[in-house]
């Protein structure tokens, strides 16, 4: 599960670093922003690399590491929010929300979903073990028509073939566990995919 969570944060950090550099420049140019605030924006962008390293090294079975990761999530997400100069930027807000949703999902999987995850692994659930909501092949595809079809297929199977994760999690754990899992992963789906989950119960 950590593999695709890492893919998701790479998506956020790519957006954040590309966009963040321009934010920092705009903060410096804005008439009501000080140079200090502009450099603080640049520092936020530079912290993305450190944040990515923490994710790569994170042992989701180590509660102390997860707690430290949770603290760094809050600190990182608040980085741009502390800058009070200039108008609120919708793109900046979107990236902050993506980071928050991602962090919530990682902490949820490591803490709240840990027992259910263990049950599914002990059961050797094929659906759970083969679950790959962000297939690598999508990024590697250069043909736009094929890529569009792959994205549609990824959305259709986001919770496993024929929505099999709902059945697996509900039967092995509970409906409450399924709803928590569903809600957290819908929250991070818009990082790499644009899916319509209105019919997912």
Curated annotation (Swiss-Prot):
Instruction: Please give the Pfam families that the UniProt record associates with this protein.
Output: DUF19
Q: Where are the annotated glycans?
A: 32, 124
Cytoplasmic side, ranges:
1-3
**Protein's membrane topology:** Single-pass type II membrane protein
Q: Does the keyword Mitochondrion apply?
A: no
**What is the protein's name according to its record?**
UPF0376 protein F10G2.1
Q: List the disulfide bonds.
A: none
Which stretches are Extracellular in the membrane topology?
A: 25-201
Residue ranges spanning the membrane: these are 4-24
Task: Spell out the family assignment given in the record's similarity comment.
Answer: Belongs to the UPF0376 family.
Q: Which UniProt keywords apply?
A: Glycoprotein, Membrane, Signal-anchor, Transmembrane, Transmembrane helix
Tell me where it resides: Membrane
Annotated organism of origin? Caenorhabditis elegans
Major place of localization?
membrane
| Superkingdom per UniProt | Eukaryota
């Amino acid at each position: 599960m950590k593999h695709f969570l890492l893919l998701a944060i790479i998506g956020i950090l790519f957006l954040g670093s590309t966009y963040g550099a321009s934010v920092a420049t705009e903060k410096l140019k804005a008439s009501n922003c000080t140079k200090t605030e502009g450099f603080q924006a640049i520092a936020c962008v530079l912290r993305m690399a450190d944040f990515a390293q923490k994710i790569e090294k994170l042992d989701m079975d180590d509660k102390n590491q997860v707690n430290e990761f949770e603290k760094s999530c809050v600190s990182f997400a608040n980085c741009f929010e502390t800058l009070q100069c200039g108008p609120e930027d919708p793109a900046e807000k979107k990236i902050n929300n993506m980071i928050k949703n991602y962090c919530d999902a990682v902490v949820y999987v490591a803490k709240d979903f840990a027992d259910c995850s263990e049950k599914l692994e002990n059961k050797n659930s094929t659906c759970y073990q083969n679950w790959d909501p962000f297939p690598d092949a999508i990024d590697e595809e250069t043909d736009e028509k094929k890529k569009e079809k792959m994205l549609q297929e990824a959305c259709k199977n986001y919770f496993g073939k024929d929505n099999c994760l709902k059945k697996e999690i509900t039967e092995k754990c509970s409906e409450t566990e399924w709803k928590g899992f569903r809600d957290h992963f819908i929250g991070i789906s818009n990082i790499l995919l644009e899916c319509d989950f209105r019919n997912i119960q």
